Amino acid sequence: MSKLSNSGNESKNTLYCSFCGKSQHEVRKLIAGPTVFICDECVELCMDIIREENKSSGIKARDGVPTPQEIITVLDDYVIGQQHAKRVLSVAVHNHYKRLAHQSKSNDIELAKSNILLVGPTGCGKTYLAQTLARIIDVPFTMADATTLTEAGYVGEDVENIILKLLQAADYNVERAQRGIVYIDEVDKISRKADNPSITRDVSGEGVQQALLKIMEGTIASVPPQGGRKHPQQEFLQVDTTNILFICGGAFAGLERIISGRGEKTSIGFSATVKAPDERCVGEIFRDLEPEDLIKFGLIPEFIGRLPIVATLEDLDVNALVQILSKPKNALVKQYQRLFEMENVELAFHEDALRVIAKKAIERKTGARGLRSIMEKILLETMFELPALEGVQKVVISSDVVDGKAHPLYIYSERTEDKENVSA
């Protein structure tokens, strides 16, 4: 009788997998949840199903590459102007992901990767274009600042850290990361410090260019999972950079002088010819850009060779900046109007006020990037006072307010006036 009772107690204490029904003695591991149990075999089966689904979804994404027209239509919703740069980028990105979609289908011709160089004045939309592109294609995207990079073994960020950031953006999914986009900003700051090779090692300029060559062309990068410096006891993640699209961008201050002065014959004395200064704006001069100009600026020929597609961006004029303020889906005016809506107040700008804001941004030579700081300065006092005021229905900003000659116009609701009349 006692033997039967013992066996009964054992069966009561035995735990079973809620999915396959196997007992804890039949499997290696049983994981407990709040009210359920799952065995290691069911976990492995689930992982296999998820892997297969990820592969199939990846194939679908590869087959559904957006056309250049579709890409440029979405870019137009967010980025004002820069039509030439948009065309170059949309065609380049379409061809890149089309190449990835069909590389496994045909083995006769191997299509090479074409990385992109964006050249344009500060605040003209280089970084924003790259961010919007990654959002359209729905691939992992990361940004890196070239000024923080140093050659391996020196204080600063290793080049491999760029791939680590991309891996983190892909939630450590190596397959997704290997199809991502990397944007390297301020690439003009890693130019060679002098035309002549120096005895001392240039670890943050030419050294970084040399370090970027292999990952931009395609190599197996060993990435430490936690980031930072490598050490022998650490396990590495292997990431193939062959199919990662690299977009480099920079303002290249002073490059316009190199382009304008190309082919000039210098002479001195009474017979010297004085050439009139180039009165074109920076964006127009950049259209005549040649690889030799970039070499003279300080980029090494091997680095330029890894960036076969060059897209130049134009200066933003007053009309373009006014459109940037009001037209895109996430325009600055719309952002501040939403902030004021949270206080149940309508915010309105006169057209001439927006033009004055645009002119101020051009005077500061900060492009579209300077618009936010100007808007903050104009609306600071209003945003400070508004939460404490009652009955304000609308705030109107005129050109005099932007110039500092007047205060914003507050329009109060009729309810407060009615209350005053009743009390009287």
From Swiss-Prot:
Residue ranges occupied by any ClpX-type ZB domain in the UniProt entry: 5-58
SMART domains assigned: AAA, ClpB_D2-small, zf-C4_ClpX
Transmembrane domains' residue ranges: none
Annotated binding of Zn(2+), by residue: C17, C20, C39, C42
Keywords: ATP-binding, Chaperone, Metal-binding, Nucleotide-binding, Zinc
CDD domains the UniProt entry points to: RecA-like_ClpX
Annotated residues for binding of ATP: P121, T122, G123, C124, G125, K126, T127, Y128
Gene Ontology terms: biological process: cell division; proteolysis involved in protein catabolic process
Gene Ontology CC annotations of this record: HslUV protease complex
Pfam families reported in the protein's UniProt record: AAA_2, ClpB_D2-small, zf-C4_ClpX
Keyword ATP-binding carried by entry: yes
MF terms in GO: ATP binding; ATP hydrolysis activity; ATP-dependent protein folding chaperone; protein dimerization activity; unfolded protein binding; zinc ion binding
NCBIfam families, sorted: clpX, PRK05342.1
Record text on subunit structure and interactions: Component of the ClpX-ClpP complex. Forms a hexameric ring that, in the presence of ATP, binds to fourteen ClpP subunits assembled into a disk-like structure with a central cavity, resembling the structure of eukaryotic proteasomes.
Function: ATP-dependent specificity component of the Clp protease. It directs the protease to specific substrates. Can perform chaperone functions in the absence of ClpP.
Protein family membership: Belongs to the ClpX chaperone family.
Protein name as catalogued: ATP-dependent Clp protease ATP-binding subunit ClpX
